[in-house]
Design a protein with these regions (language model features):
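PRPP-associated nucleotide enzymes
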Residues: 1-206
Length: 206
């Protein structure tokens, strides 16, 4: 499995704001969108293009346009914070949803909803899950996507923990993870340290 940490001054600046416990909900949402834009730009670097003839105002020329079929699948609800930025850069992307809920007492995820486009085998599938902590939610979603034909899923996470990475290496070795940071590890409640808290709660003000 490939883990790619996106190193860029703008990523560091956005991450600093997301980590700050005093960042208000509205600012947190804007920062999440910016983080998504930066991660998506890196994660789509190798998408397939095709030559296309056009006319500029001055002369005919050949340009390259995106031809890859792209599917974005946010994990409800936290993954919704990455969807706006994704669609801003890839507006033609199809969108699916995986509803996953973590039992806070056991940190075990359960799947309660799924609605994804058909024929995932011929698509480049991006899973949007901003916090890769234990890896349970991501592994469950990737398993579900694989059952529907997806191969080589690209996981976009703002912060990852070594424990979550290790779990995916064992269960989903063909996945590529794009993240802004790999943090120290998990606490006894399975939250990432130093992390940024509960992403979904901070995104939605709950």
């Amino acid at each position: 499995m490939d883990v790619r940490v996106v190193r860029h001054p703008l990523v560091e600046d956005v991450l600093a704001g997301l980590r700050d416990r005093h960042t208000p909900c509205d600012v947190f949402r804007r920062l999440a969108r910016r983080a998504s834009l930066l991660l998506v730009a890196e994660a789509t670097r190798d998408l397939s293009l095709r030559d296309h003839a056009i006319d500029t105002p001055l002369e005919p020329t050949t340009v390259r346009r995106l031809v890859a079929r792209v599917v974005a699948v946010p994990v409800l609800r936290a993954g919704l914070g990455l969807l706006e930025g994704f669609l801003e850069l890839v507006p033609q992307a199809e969108v699916g949803y995986f509803g996953l809920e973590r039992d806070e007492s056991t940190a075990v995820a359960r799947r309660y909803y799924e609605k994804v486009p058909k024929r995932l085998r011929d698509a480049v599938v991006f899973l949007l899950d901003p916090m890769l902590a234990t890896g349970g939610s991501a592994a469950l979603a990737i398993e579900g996507l694989a059952e529907l034909g997806a191969r080589g899923v690209r996981l976009l996470s703002i912060v990852a923990a070594p424990e979550g990475i290790a779990r995916l290496q064992a269960s989903a070795p063909d996945v590529t993870v794009y993240t802004a940071a790999v943090d120290r590890g998990l606490n006894e409640r399975k939250f990432i340290l130093p992390g940024l808290g509960d992403f979904g709660d901070r995104l939605f003000g709950t």
